A protein has these predicted regions:
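N-terminal Rossmann-like dinucleotide-binding module
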Residues: 1-52
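Rossmann-fold dehydrogenase core element
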Residues: 108-128, 147-154
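Predominantly a Rossmann-like dinucleotide-binding segment in NAD(P)-dependent oxidoreductases
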Residues: 128-216
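Contiguous beta-strand/loop segments that form the cofactor/metal-binding neighborhood of enzyme cores
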Residues: 187-269, 299-311, 328-329
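Active-site loop of classical SDR/Rossmann-like NAD(P)-dependent oxidoreductases
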Residues: 40-43, 289-300, 315
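C-terminal helix-rich "cap/oligomerization" subdomain common to oxidoreductases
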Residues: 1-4, 32, 63, 71-74, ...
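Beta-loop-alpha module in the N-terminal Rossmann-like domain of NAD(P)-dependent dehydrogenases
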Residues: 22, 43, 52-114
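Hydrophobic residues in well-ordered beta-strands that form the structural core
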Residues: 74, 97, 122-124, 264
């Protein structure tokens, strides 16, 4: 009888709301053992420990790295992502990080270089890829059923803004709504088009209704970005915080081909419920509807790769740098 392989032992660095959500999803998947919780906030650590009572609770990355773990999930403020991920990778741990991987393409490249050098698995929580709606859209695009897909429109308007002060400090966050929300949209667009070269990037970025210039030090609350891809195909991205959207959020993505189109949109302003449709001329076929418990799937996919692949480097991590480079270009840096 074949001996059962032990589950990967992982730690969590940062256990705020999103960290605890991903922790719960990984526990429920039974793909890994949560062996350590690290958070400087005792309340967050205590709440996380209730989900994983067998995990050791520590207060620093240093302490976590001493435990001989296989991997770490990083869910800390953005300013720490690059340095924390690099330290973990150099210590031999695989890494799953909240987006953004870095505040710039330079930081993202540093992390990817470290993952490659250490031969460790690197993932980033671009979670919208794993909604049922987006998965079914991607299948249609990849199948060729839509013909040549030549244009895409992607939108994420949030009627609220982040509740943490660091989001509004460009040095700490790397940017405003474009970094926070637009990164998801740029990731989706490049993924759907299979990571082509980007010929040009133009943008209009605002704060409080005033156009921002590069290097202003302010973070934006509204951004529109246009991409022209190597084959001339066009992508438009728009995102915002605190916009008068008439609902909690407007989240939509549409892809148009020579033989049809696909789109997904949120339902009644929800941040979590989506429908997707397949367009043929003036007809629309619904291909995905709620409910769909998708929030932790990206993390579970990463931990499954960790378990089955031994945590080795996946070259798809190189694509994370392209997402960051597009954001850099949109910011004019």
């Amino acid at each position: 009888m074949k001996k059962k392989q032990p589950l990967p032992r992982i730690g969590f660095l940062g256990t705020g709301w999103i960290g605890r959500h991903r922790l719960k999803a990984i526990l429920e998947s039974r793909e890994a053992e949560v062996a350590c919780i690290a958070d400087v906030c005792r309340e967050n650590a205590s709440d996380a420990a209730k989900l994983a009572p067998g995990a050791l609770v520590v207060d620093s990355l240093d302490a976590l790295l001493e435990l001989g773990l296989d991997a770490v999930v990083i869910a800390t403020p953005s300013a720490g992502h690059c340095s924390q991920a690099v330290r973990a990778l150099e210590a031999g741990l695989s890494v799953f990080c909240q987006k953004p991987l870095g505040r710039s393409a330079y930081e993202a490249q540093m992390v990817v270089n470290s993952a490659r050098a250490a031969n460790r698995l690197l993932g980033v929580d671009f979670s919208y890829r794993f909604t049922d709606a987006v998965q079914k859209m991607h299948q249609l695009v990849s199948s060729g059923e839509l013909g040549e897909v030549y244009a895409a429109d992607l939108v994420f308007h949030n009627a609220y803004g982040p509740d943490k002060a660091w989001f509004y400090d460009a040095e700490l966050s790397g940017g405003g709504c474009l970094m926070d929300l637009g990164s998801h949209l740029v990731d989706l667009a490049l993924w759907f088009f299979d990571y082509p070269q980007v010929r040009s990037v133009s943008s209009s970025i605002f704060s409080g209704g005033q156009r921002l210039k590069g290097g202003s030090g302010k973070v934006e609350d509204y951004a529109v970005v246009s991409l022209v891809l190597e084959n001339g195909h066009a992508v438009r991205v728009a995102c915002s915080w605190n916009v008068s959207a008439g609902r909690d959020a407007v989240i939509e993505s549409s892809f148009y081909g020579t033989q049809g189109g696909v789109a997904f949109r949120n339902v009644q302003g929800s941040f979590y419920d989506f429908v997707a449709e397949h367009f043929r001329g003036t007809s629309a076929e619904t291909i995905a509807t709620p409910p769909d418990d998708w929030g932790g799937r990206c993390a579970v996919d990463w931990v499954r790769q960790l378990r089955t692949g031994g945590g080795s480097y996946n070259p798809q991590a190189e694509n994370l740098v392209q997402v960051a480079a597009v954001l850099d270009a949109a910011y004019g840096r």
